[in-house]
Regions:
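A structural signal for multi-pass alpha-helical bundles of membrane permease subunits
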Residues: 4-294
Length: 294
């Protein structure tokens, strides 16, 4: 091998090695270890453990109602977030893009909540739901605002959705805005000349041109919604009565609260990984197909 080519590969390895080492230590090795321990009864501390095969998986899917309830709640949360977050972000992006002078102001205002930590946002909204809204209801006689936003299982889900949207819509809006700026103005003008109204222009011209951004936003929303933890922990802690417990909270509880069943929690993590992988592959396949058609 010539010295120049050898030197080139050495330089590439020198620059990429630190990142690869950190990736292996903090992501690859823990992932492989978690998959291995999911087939054991390890408690996370004792070096002696037994290989139990698929026992943890069978127990979690057949004999653990708390896990199944948290899985169902998480799936419901994911579905609502995918729809609402992307629709709201796209609507805001279109409205802001249509403005000329105040575009920067509104872009900053709607993005600011994303700059606040999720757990801090949850604590802020806890105060709003438990103190501010009841006082407004008392002084204005609007009974709707005085309901138990965090204590009622039927209402607490919507409280979590509200805070999640408030915290995450701005980020998706920025992605859509960046994509909208790449849509040629001449195409919109041609559609208007042909008699298309604003909605028809959006549906037939704008949306096909930003399908790649929609794919990215759908993927980010799907990934983030399945991993949700802080907002639920800060608002309800999974209550009342575990009615708002998401799957990540159930896994954490199993690993560090319920007799330190680390192997059992690892099995649940593998199940979550498989579910996210399946949903992601389906979503990417559908969206990529639409990108090609567009």
């Amino acid at each position: 091998m010539p010295f120049k080519i050898y030197k080139k590969y050495v330089m590439l390895l020198a620059f990429t090695a630190p990142a690869l080492i950190f990736y292996a230590i903090f992501l690859l090795i823990p992932t492989i270890s978690g998959m291995y321990y999911s087939f054991t009864d390890w408690n996370g501390l004792n070096p002696n453990y037994n290989f139990i095969g698929l026992g943890n998986f069978v127990e979690s899917l057949k004999e653990d109602p708390d896990f199944l309830n948290s899985l169902w709640f998480t799936l419901k949360y994911v579905l609502v977030m995918i729809v609402l977050q992307n629709v709201l972000a796209l609507v805001l992006a279109v409205l802001i893009e249509s403005r000329t002078r105040s575009k920067g102001f509104f872009r900053t205002i709607f993005f600011m909540p994303n700059m606040i930590s999720t757990i801090i946002s949850a604590f802020m909204w806890t105060f709003v739901f438990s103190s501010v809204l009841p006082q407004i209801a008392e002084k204005t006689a609007i009974a709707f605002l005085g309901q138990s936003w965090l204590g009622d299982p039927k209402v607490s889900f919507f409280s979590i959705i509200i805070v999640s949207l408030w915290n995450g819509v701005g980020y998706m809006m920025i992605i859509y805005l960046a994509s909208l700026q790449g849509v040629p103005q001449s195409l919109k003008e041609a559609a208007i000349i042909d008699g298309a109204n604003a909605f028809q222009t959006l549906r037939s011209v704008t949306l096909p041109m930003i399908t790649h951004a929609i794919t990215i936003c759908f993927f980010l929303t799907l990934n983030g919604a399945f991993k949700v933890y802080e907002v639920v922990y800060g608002l309800t802690g999974g209550g009342p009565g575990r009615s708002t417990q998401v799957i990540t909270m159930n896994i954490y509880e199993e690993a560090f609260s319920n007799n330190f069943r680390y192997g059992y929690a690892s099995a649940k993590s593998v199940i979550l990984f498989a579910i996210v992988l399946i949903f992601t592959l389906i979503q990417l396949r559908v969206m990529k197909k639409r990108e090609v058609e567009a």
